[in-house]
Amino acid sequence: MADKEALPKLREDFKMQNKSVFILGASGETGKVLLKEILGQNLFSKVTLIGRRKLTFEEEAYKNVNQEVVDFEKLDVYASAFQGHDVGFCCLGTTRSKAGAEGFVRVDRDYVLKSAELAKAGGCKHFNLLSSRGADKSSSFLYLQVKGEVEAKVEELKFDRLSVFRPGVLLCDRQESRPGEWLARKFFGSLPDSWASGYAVPVVTVVRAMLNNLVSPSSGQMELLENKAILHLGKDRDVPKL
């Protein structure tokens, strides 16, 4: 990871490369903030959203955002949507309470993995995966097991660069109700950073960590950033505002 003092120059150097990016899950809490930050920092020459429905934006800054509407149950038919992107961000995810156990696995593992496969085939060099603290394919908890499984499967695809982010409880005003998460946000949000750093993180911090890591030199083919590393890397406040 680069020293924070070097980030402004790294951002400018990255912009000069005129890269393109796609975002999966731009309608979710993390995806929405990610899109806003990407546009605010003006990092890419082309920004594409891939999702099951077209999103509506009123702000002028979003006017050049491309959108590809796909059926995640038939992703092979939409392979062209994944072609020609240098960088990909995957923020796809649902909950067991909303989709049921099978639906959760379908979205968080199958959709994510198939999207990664198509992105790799389409020329994506750097894939960024939003996972979860505690992800472990051997876990007895379905959520952590699925997150661990998809991490391992995506790593097998051998992207030139794979960055996996494992945040703790995401601190945000989530529109979708997730049992237990609201209480966790209230609890961790009231604690000093030094206490909460291993367990919780603001969504905007996760997003800024993703983008600061993006413009920084790679530390290897596969990078795994746990919650504390995300907090450290994402606290840079010297970023452009949209």
Swiss-Prot record:
NADPH binds at S27, G28, E29, T30, R52, R53, L92, G93, Y143, K147, L170, R178. Disruption phenotype: Mice are haploinsufficient for tumor suppression. 50% develop tumors within their second year. 30% of the tumors are hepatocellular carcinomas. Mice develop more cardiac hypertrophy and cardiac dilation following transverse aortic constriction (TAC) surgery. Gene3D superfamilies: NAD(P)-binding Rossmann-like Domain. GO terms for biological process: alpha-amino acid biosynthetic process; angiogenesis; apoptotic process; cell differentiation; positive regulation of programmed cell death; positive regulation of transcription by RNA polymerase II. Residues 2-25 are annotated as: Required for interaction with elongation factor EEF1A1. GO terms for cellular component: cytoplasm; nuclear envelope. Monomer. Forms homodimers during oxidative stress. Interacts (via N-terminus) with elongation factor EEF1A1 (via middle-region); the interaction is direct and competes with EEF1A1 binding to guanyl-nucleotide exchange factor EEF1B2, thereby inhibiting GDP for GTP exchange and reactivation of EEF1A1. Interacts with nuclear transport receptors XPO4, IPO5/RANBP5, IPO7, IPO9 and KPNB1 as well as GCN1L1/GCN1 and LRPPRC probably through their HEAT repeats. Binds NCOA5/CIA. This is Protein HTATIP2. It comes from Mus musculus (Mouse). The lineage of its organism: Eukaryota, Metazoa, Chordata, Craniata, Vertebrata. The gene is Htatip2.
